[in-house]
A protein has these predicted regions:
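N-terminal localization/anchoring segments of enzymes in phospholipid and broader phosphate metabolism
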Residues: 1-537, 555, 559, 571-708
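Glycine/threonine-rich ATP-lid/beta-loop region of ATP-binding domains
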Residues: 547-550, 554
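Hydrophobic alpha/beta core scaffold segments
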Residues: 562-566
């Protein structure tokens, strides 16, 4: 019997491998290839902190447990290490052997210290002495307390030997004679990592800050010479949960979690050296295994090179600019109240601008007829205009209530700051729910329209974050549908006050009803499926890991239901297995925008339904988070969403298809086929719509009236 489920962690690694695949594409602009390499690194940072740490904890607590994909924690850790070592090796080989030389061809030449000419050596020597040396703090390691190494910060390690052993014995700063003389220097955050060199004839050359510290770091240790050195960083366990049963202040409890994250156990050492003495020293001190150590050649962190985007050369080495079009259904200058009273409006970022969401909140803050604003915030970014609008609304006397989810991983500190700032401005802030993360994205404005109090609702698959809205593909809906508005009211009452679970008529809410609704709709497809008219399920999401849902999809496949899945990241479902999943196809898209929308289509005989959601089909989303799934009821919007969904299954440029052996195979252009790149097709659709609208505007006659 073939495996029924792929392993979650190994499936995630395959997702990062698909990102790396794009970095190898020679047809992509150079800076975009470098960007994909950088994403591989940042993704691994989170993966090791959260997922690898989780498996390591399981190995300690329950070492013999076997997961549904057949792995014990120990065997899984071996597989993780082998796959990650392979990807990281390929990543850095591509960086140093292909991308760095290509940068040099584009007049952005990375230079090692050994390659500097005499003039440049004088420059870097003076630069180090004047601009770098004052920032550096050497940390000795022979004291009883090993120096604290900050999670994900980069360091230089020096293995030292006394120049004069007799003289060193008499020094009050000699340290423990028997201890290895290893010292650390943290690479300062306040300095640019790229140091430009003096050149002639307009040529641009640079060295990296860390290599200056490697070269001149001896100056930090008078009386010693450097035998060996290397650059390194560590990743620590970051998968902490707050004590939600604590009687103390919840913000204080969250701050304790942030402190713990900086001193937890180490799960990875990434370094640039084969210096066995330093590696062995760190291995012992950090209590790690050989499988946890990743040694790379050349530049440790490709992300430092992304600053090259800001150069004149770098600006010409990226994707051609794609405009974010203002939706033609919404007026740029006037408030949206009149439009939304008559129709639902779909917003598709980043092809369409995120400005309407900001304008919607800003208009509500300033409108004298608006009585109240309620919304959820999960990740909203820095310098958010949404926060400014909410504060202004409170200052204008509106009742403003915001649920800020403090437990949004790696955004806890920022969200604590927003919560405090909003409270200081007079906003009522709710800090989420006990033992549940609120991941739903919903905004409701209550306004007095003539003699009627009307509720304007915005629901989204993505966060209220203007910055990521330029990079993540998400769908959202503006509506005044009465059933949805009534459900929105009940939702806010449940998450901000005390309430029994309320039955919702149009919305589905996790952990209450999304899972059961999905299972019911899958079963409905099975019940209505015939040989003449087989059922059809089409779904797009970030990850698919919920075993109950996967089993239901297997059952649907066996009943003849056709299942098309677009899964960007983790997929534990095994497709294409006869007698289990032969009617299931799984594809994944990795392109310039991160695919983030969740779209679920059920054919339902001749009465098809489409839902959008904040939730993926994962246990955490369906059982441990507060999520919302909302129907598309407007016929025009329904048609639009279905056309968007269909495009993702036409892609033959940036798609991979999952096979039953777990391999993701690139979907290639076949002979006679036209090129179909889903994101480009969507961009061109919105551009045509915008261009057509602009032409219509130009043809309209505007009568100039006499000003009295």
């Amino acid at each position: 019997m073939e495996t029924k489920f792929f392993n979650r962690e190994l499936s995630w690694i395959e997702f990062n491998n698909r990102i790396l695949y794009n970095a190898f594409k020679k047809e992509l602009p150079l800076m975009e290839r470098l960007q994909f390499l950088s994403i591989v690194s940042s993704n691994f940072d989170e993966f090791f902190q959260v997922r690898v740490a989780s498996v390591k904890r399981l190995e300690k607590s329950n070492p013999k447990v076997i997961d549904d994909s057949g792995y014990t924690p120990k065997s899984l850790l071996r597989q993780i290490s082998a796959k990650c070592h392979k990807i990281i090796k390929e990543q850095h080989s591509l960086l140093m052997n292909e991308l760095v030389p290509l940068l040099a061809e584009k007049n952005l030449k990375y230079t090692t210290i050994a390659e500097l000419d005499a003039k440049q050596k004088i420059f870097v020597t003076e630069f180090f002495e004047n601009e770098v040396f004052p920032f550096l703090t050497p940390l000795r390691t022979d004291s009883n307390l090993f120096p604290h190494l900050i999670n994900l910060s980069e360091y230089i390690a020096f293995y030292l030997k006394a120049e004069d052993a007799e003289k060193q014995k008499k020094s009050p700063f000699k340290g423990n004679d028997k201890a290895s003389k290893v010292a650390f220097v943290q690479i300062p955050n306040g300095l640019d990592r790229i140091v430009w060199l003096p050149t002639e004839n307009g040529k641009k050359q640079f060295v990296l800050l860390e290599e200056l510290i490697l070269e001149f770091g001896k100056a930090l240790f008078p009386g010693f010479y450097v035998k060996e050195s290397m650059i390194f960083k560590i990743a620590r366990d970051a998968d902490f949960s707050v004590d939600e049963d604590s009687k103390g202040n919840f913000i204080k409890e969250m701050e304790k979690v942030l402190v713990k994250r900086q001193s937890s156990f180490v799960v990875q050492l990434l370094c640039t050296s084969t210096s066995q003495k330093i590696v062995d020293f760190l291995k012992k001190k950090l209590n790690i295994e050989n499988d946890d150590i990743y040694i790379v050649d050349g530049i440790l962190n490709p992300q430092v090179l992304m600053d090259l985007r800001g150069t004149s050369e770098g600006r010409n080495l990226g994707f051609s600019e794609w405009e974010h079009f203002y939706p033609v259904s919404l007026p740029k200058e006037e408030p949206y109240w009149d439009v939304l009273r008559n129709e639902d409006v779909l917003l598709h970022v980043p092809y369409e601008s995120y400005d309407p969401v900001i304008k919607f909140i800003t208009d509500a803050a300033e409108d004298e007829n608006v009585l109240s604003i309620k919304m959820t915030l999960y990740r909203t970014g820095n310098n958010s205009p949404i926060i400014s609008a909410l504060k202004k609304a409170a200052a204008n006397g509106k009742q403003v209530c915001v649920l800020v989810e403090l437990k949004a991983r790696f955004d806890e500190e920022r969200n604590i700051g927003w919560a405090n700032e909003l409270e200081s401005a007079g906003v009522t802030v709710v800090y989420g729910l006990v033992n549940l993360k609120v991941h739903a994205k919903i905004l409701m404005v209550i306004r007095k329209d003539d003699d009627i109090v009307r509720r304007y609702v915005h629901l989204s698959t993505g966060n209220y974050n203007p910055k990521t809205a330029k990079l993540y593909s998400d769908l959202s809906l503006f509506t005044t549908n009465q059933n949805i508005a009534s459900d929105a009211t009940l939702f806010f009452n449940m998450v901000t006050g005390y309430s029994d679970v309320q039955e919702l008529s149009s919305l589905n809410m996790a952990p209450i009803s999304i899972k059961s609704k999905l299972l019911d709709m899958i079963q409905r497809e099975i019940d209505k499926s015939t040989k003449e008219n087989p059922g059809l399920i089409i779904a797009k999401m970030n990850s698919l890991t919920h075993e109950d849902v996967i089993k239901a999809l297997y059952k649907a496949s066996c009943a003849g239901v056709k299942v098309l899945l677009n899964v960007r990241g983790i997929c534990m479902l095994v497709p294409g297995v006869k007698g289990m999943s032969e009617n299931i196809k799984v594809v994944s898209i990795v392109d310039r925008y991160l695919e983030h929308s969740r779209i679920f289509y059920f054919q339902n005989g001749s009465d098809s339904e489409i839902y959008l959601a904040s939730a993926d089909w994962m246990p955490r989303n369906l059982e441990r988070r507060v999520e919302l799934m909302f129907p598309i009821l407007d016929k025009k919007v329904f048609k639009e969403v279905k056309s968007i969904l269909d495009v993702y299954f036409e892609d033959n440029c940036n798609a991979h298809e999952l096979k039953k052996d777990g391999e993701w195979i690139p979907v290639l252009l076949e002979e006679g086929q036209s090129k179909r790149r889903s994101q480009e097709l969507l961009y061109k659709k919105y551009k045509r719509r915008n261009d057509s609208y602009e032409k219509i505007k130009q043809k309209k006659f505007e009568v100039r009236k006499k000003i009295e």
